[in-house]
């Protein structure tokens, strides 16, 4: 059978899709768009911006000059220095997750320097390093928000970093980090220690938190046997984070060219899955499995590697948000299958601090903005080693 992702992911896809000129607006999400507390921005105080935007479902990016909202009392203005390229950027801009409004600037792995602050801001000052991940607002009052899980806002008010309806944005939607600057509420900005380079901090704001959060929830401990399926931007960080917690990591990849790198990341064993037969020796051998595979695949084949009543967590987001599950196979395996959606703001700060303290850095390849279209194709073709990061000074 086909199993869609959790409720929050479905609502995100639905609410970021376009109906006519813009957006499918349902329930509380629609009420929020038309009843936001912030007034229309004053055009005289708009922040001039430039970025790389897609104009249609081809996803081809080109230069675009646009405006962001003024810096409000609770906002900071970040001069973006680096922005990571996530496979989600490609899925969304090409319409894999539903129709989109264009022009749209992607990017939710944003690292830069604070250049202005609103009068109520207390956590940042000009010159501080700051980052922004996958969301820029939520209701702030529901149980999920109050417990630091803003990505699961009970009032459907999570405002994702790009392509989401936003009355305060001069373009009508949030615009992401393939750009030279960003205005964001202080509460949704992450403090970046100067002990970690901005190019290394950027991928942690999505790839890092997306893998860190389920590992923490699974209470991974020393000597646990942890499987990581799909070794790309997310998977290589999952390996490093699990190893840092003392786990024995078993990595599963379809790319033989990555074997030496994966061993360097700390994996105990690397399995090149060129046929499903390669999985059989590991049947019921693992304590936990995290899958970062971003395409539809046979979940049960990988989940069968986990011990009975163990856990398998899906964090990769396939096109249309669907993966294939064989219910008969799961009945036999007795494995608990779950999904995980990024992580809340407190936990995002936690993973940044944890990685800075333990010197856990992503493997990055810095590119110019002019190379972004060809780089997207490299991501699709599994050529990334292991996270491309845009030097936004080249925009």
Q: What is the role of each PLM region?
A:
Residues 43, 69-83, 96-146, 151, ...:
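Glycine-rich beta-strand-centered segment in the early N-terminal region that forms part
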Residues 222, 228-231, 241-299:
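Adenosine-nucleotide cofactor-binding segment
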Residues 35, 293-363, 392-395:
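Glycine-rich phosphate-binding loop and adjacent beta-alpha segment
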Residues 28-70, 79, 330:
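C-terminal segment of N-terminal export signals and the immediately downstream linker at the start
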Residues 2-7, 11-31, 37-47, 300, ...:
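C-terminal hydrophobic helical "lid"/dimerization subdomain
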Residues 234:
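Hydrophobic/small residue at the entry helix of a nucleotide-binding pocket
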Residues 139-229:
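NAD(P)H dinucleotide-binding glycine-rich loop of Rossmann-like/cofactor-binding domains
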